[in-house]
């Protein structure tokens, strides 16, 4: 009877009774309405919990206390005003992208990126830079691949692999972003045209203000009703543009005025970028952990691997079709496949709440990982085989320029008529004059 009296005492306040709970006069115990999916269940501690059950009653016999479960602790009966039964404390952990470690890492990466852009600006030759501005064939080809081929490829991959709404939009956003700064570094490592690379990065970022909303408006309507054009963070685009233009412009000025200082800055920027990449990969793996990586579907991994590879191939193929020089082909190739994943991450933060986006926040990081790995393989192949082929070709060109065989000299003498020719009559006259002397 003690347990029954305690139960009756606990149920006495009317504020603790749900609206659909009635008291049976015969049984003397509360019973839940059969139409409600929620019923009162015994709680492991003080207070009541709501759980899906058809009905429950209180018997005068003592019943054993069930073990605590996660479901019994999630929903509690909250009375009006102050309650004598405290709610169970549930620890709240912020998402990994909202932690102080991630914010500090973003600041570190941003500072290293500015140093890298300063060093890349020191590699620009002002004379060749103007030539690419007057004849922007490479920049137009990169823009065609960047905002024409890659968004269409991302759209088709999302349809082929039947991705859900969040995953499809994450893939589409990454495909519509402008070129990233990784292409500038990789172009430098493969002896590409740095003037063309920087022009392509700047122009694609400027074009993103117009073409990126257009691509999102065209392709995103297949999954969501809210136009992502309204969610485009113009502040993030402007910040990306400033972080690219200002250091590069300063680097060009240093190269123009102080040549030796520019060479030193290039070396420092390359080493700083190498250290930044190592720290970034280690810290990203530490923050994410294997559980979050395992929650990503396998189809998303396939898309993250195939997209940058297709971008590199399309850029190189289009540059070959238009008969660009070999160094420009490599530059267009790397610029097309390298995307600005920082901008994609910023849009995903604004487009979806953290609890809804979940592991799809990882797709830009996966894309950055695989585009860096594939570009690294491209650089490694070039360093192993491409440089040897180029050296052999340069040696052949030098041999042709320094060929001083008798046949070649004879042909040049016969073809050289800049000083006139000597006829037979002039030759007889010269012989007579010499005899007279």
UniProtKB/Swiss-Prot annotation:
A GO CC term attached to the entry: serotonergic synapse
Main localization of the protein described in the UniProt heading: membrane
Transmembrane segments annotated in the record for this chain: 104-124, 141-161, 198-218, 234-254, 268-288, 292-312, 361-381
Extracellular side: 1-103, 162-197, 255-267, 313-360
Carbohydrate attachment residues: 6, 20, 181, 195
Places the protein is found: Cell membrane
Gene3D superfamilies named among the record's database cross-references: 1.20.1530.20
InterPro entries: BilAc:Na_symport/Acr3 (IPR002657), Bilac:Na_transpt (IPR004710), Na+/solute_symporter_sf (IPR038770)
Membrane topology: Multi-pass membrane protein
Protein name, per record: Sodium/bile acid cotransporter 4
């Amino acid at each position: 009877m003690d347990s029954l009296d305690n139960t009756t005492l606990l149920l006495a306040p009317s504020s603790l009774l749900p609206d659909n709970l009635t008291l049976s006069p015969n049984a003397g115990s509360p019973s839940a309405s059969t139409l409600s999916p929620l019923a009162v269940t015994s709680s492991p501690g003080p207070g009541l919990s709501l759980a899906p059950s058809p009905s429950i009653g209180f018997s005068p016999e003592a019943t054993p206390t069930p073990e605590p479960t996660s479901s019994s602790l999630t929903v509690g009966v909250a009375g009006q005003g102050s309650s004598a039964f405290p709610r169970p404390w549930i620890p709240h952990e912020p998402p990994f992208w909202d932690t102080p470690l991630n914010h500090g890492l973003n600041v570190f990466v941003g500072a290293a990126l500015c140093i890298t852009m300063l060093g890349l600006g020191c590699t620009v030759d002002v004379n060749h830079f103007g030539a690419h501005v007057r004849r922007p064939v490479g920049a137009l080809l990169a823009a065609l691949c960047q905002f024409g081929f890659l968004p269409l490829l991302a759209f088709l991959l999302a349809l082929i692999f039947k991705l859900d709404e969040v995953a499809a939009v994450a893939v589409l956003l990454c495909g519509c972003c402008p070129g990233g700064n990784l292409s500038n570094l990789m172009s430098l490592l493969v002896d590409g045209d740095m003037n063309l690379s920087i022009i392509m990065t700047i122009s694609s970022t400027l074009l993103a203000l117009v073409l990126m909303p257009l691509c999102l408006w065209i392709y995103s309507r297949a999954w969501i009703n809210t136009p992502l054009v309204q969610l485009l963070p113009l502040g993030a685009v402007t910040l990306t543009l400033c972080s690219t233009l200002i250091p590069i412009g300063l680097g060009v000025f240093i190269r123009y005025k102080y040549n030796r200082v520019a060479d030193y800055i290039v070396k420092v920027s390359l080493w700083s970028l190498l250290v930044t990449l190592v720290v970034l990969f280690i810290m990203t793996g530490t923050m994410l952990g294997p559980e979050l990586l395992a929650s990503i579907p396998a189809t998303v991994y396939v898309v993250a691997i195939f997209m940058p590879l297709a971008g590199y191939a399309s850029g190189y193929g289009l540059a070959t079709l238009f008969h660009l020089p070999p160094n420009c082909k490599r530059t267009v190739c790397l610029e097309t496949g390298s995307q600005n994943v920082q901008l994609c991450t910023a849009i995903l933060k604004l487009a979806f709440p953290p609890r809804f986006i979940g592991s799809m926040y990882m797709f830009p990081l996966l894309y950055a990982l695989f585009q860096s790995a594939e570009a690294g393989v491209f650089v490694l192949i070039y360093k192993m085989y491409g440089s040897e082929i180029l050296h052999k070709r340069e040696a052949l060109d030098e041999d042709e320029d320094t060929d001083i065989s008798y046949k070649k000299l004879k042909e040049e003498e016969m073809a050289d008529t800049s000083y006139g020719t000597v006829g037979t009559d002039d030759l007889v006259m010269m012989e007579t004059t010499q005899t007279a002397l």
